[in-house]
């Protein structure tokens, strides 16, 4: 059976060596905690922003926007089996779609209403840019 759990990835309410798959999407995580809960051969799938993720929006929010930093990751006890980027433009049909996207970001909570209106007016599309990685938990050695 499948069960989905939402919790702090640094202190998962899950027994050790019981999970076949752990999925981490746009959140910090603990390799040690993932290694604890995954069975040997279990899969850790991570999705993080790649350099150009929502860059057009960031360019309207900040004077000097920075690209997301992407670093080569090492996870002790894991073997990386996938490191791919998913990248595509996302065009908007109306202002409601723009506002819905902005509300899903931390930028929304910092924007005064007048600034939000300007951004909605100027934003035509954004780049969706994800980094998807898969890691297999290696068998423990004595």
Predicted regions and their residues:
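A short acidic, Gly/Pro-enriched loop at the edge of an enzyme's catalytic core
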Residues: 10-22
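Residues lining the SAM
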Residues: 20, 25, 47
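A short glycine-rich, Lys/Arg-flanked "PGG" loop and its adjoining helix->strand segment in the class I
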Residues: 29-45
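Active-site capping/gating segments
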Residues: 65-99
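Short, acidic/turn-prone active-site loops that include or flank metal/cofactor-
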Residues: 9-10, 29, 48-53
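Conserved class I S-adenosyl-L-methionine
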Residues: 43-76
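Conserved Class I S-adenosyl-L-methionine
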Residues: 86-142
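Conserved SAM-binding strand-loop segment of SAM-dependent methyltransferases
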Residues: 1-12
């Amino acid at each position: 059976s499948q069960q989905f759990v939402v919790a702090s990835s640094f202190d998962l309410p899950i027994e050790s060596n019981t999970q076949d798959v752990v999925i981490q999407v746009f959140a910090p995580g603990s390799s040690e905690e993932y290694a604890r809960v995954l069975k040997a051969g279990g899969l850790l799938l991570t999705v993080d922003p790649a350099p150009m993720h929502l860059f057009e929006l960031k360019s309207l929010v900040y004077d000097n926007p920075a690209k997301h930093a992407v670093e080569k990751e090492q996870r002790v006890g894991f073997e990386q089996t996938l490191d791919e980027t998913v990248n595509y433009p996302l065009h908007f049909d109306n202002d409601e779609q723009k506002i819905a996207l902005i509300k899903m970001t931390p930028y929304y909570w910092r924007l005064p209403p007048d600034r939000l209106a300007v951004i909605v007016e100027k934003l035509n599309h954004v780049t969706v840019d994800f980094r998807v990685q898969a890691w297999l938990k290696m068998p423990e050695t004595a």
